[in-house]
From Swiss-Prot:
Belongs to the bacterial ribosomal protein bL31 family. Type B subfamily. The keyword Ribosomal protein applies. Part of the 50S ribosomal subunit. Keywords: Ribonucleoprotein, Ribosomal protein. PANTHER family: 50S RIBOSOMAL PROTEIN L31, CHLOROPLASTIC (PTHR33280), LARGE RIBOSOMAL SUBUNIT PROTEIN BL31C (PTHR33280:SF1). This is Large ribosomal subunit protein bL31B. It comes from Paraburkholderia phymatum (strain DSM 17167 / CIP 108236 / LMG 21445 / STM815). One of its GO terms (molecular function) is structural constituent of ribosome. NCBIfam families: L31 (TIGR00105), PRK01678.1 (NF002462). InterPro entries: Ribosomal_bL28/bL31-like_sf (IPR034704), Ribosomal_bL31 (IPR002150), Ribosomal_bL31_B (IPR027493), Ribosomal_bL31_sf (IPR042105). It comes from the Bacteria. One of its GO terms (cellular component) is ribonucleoprotein complex. PROSITE patterns: RIBOSOMAL_L31 (PS01143). One of its GO terms (biological process) is translation.
Length: 87
């Protein structure tokens, strides 16, 4: 294989920010942060949803609004959606 053209494939620590679930897998993701897990330091990737928190895998229904999309929509269109037409 040619040198210098392939991404760095290494073990990376992923943390599910919704429930602090941690797992290590191999990935080419580029990160600046590191964290210690089971006595070893890994590059750190923070994720919003994993199999431990996704409703499909957990069987629980919940609204996943980590970016505040619902509040942003209600702020922008709330008056129109509730029947109060702003003119």
């Amino acid at each position: 294989m040619k040198e210098g053209i392939h991404p760095d494939y290494r073990e990376v620590l992923f943390i599910d920010m919704s429930n602090d679930f941690k797992f290590v897998t191999r990935s080419t993701i580029q990160t600046r942060e590191t964290a210690e897990f089971n006595g070893k330091t890994y590059p750190l990737a923070k994720i919003e949803v994993s199999s431990e928190s996704h409703p499909f895998y957990t069987g629980q229904q919940k609204i996943m609004d980590t970016a505040g999309r619902v509040e942003k929509f209600n702020k922008k269109f709330g008056a129109r959606a509730s029947g109060k037409a702003a003119k």
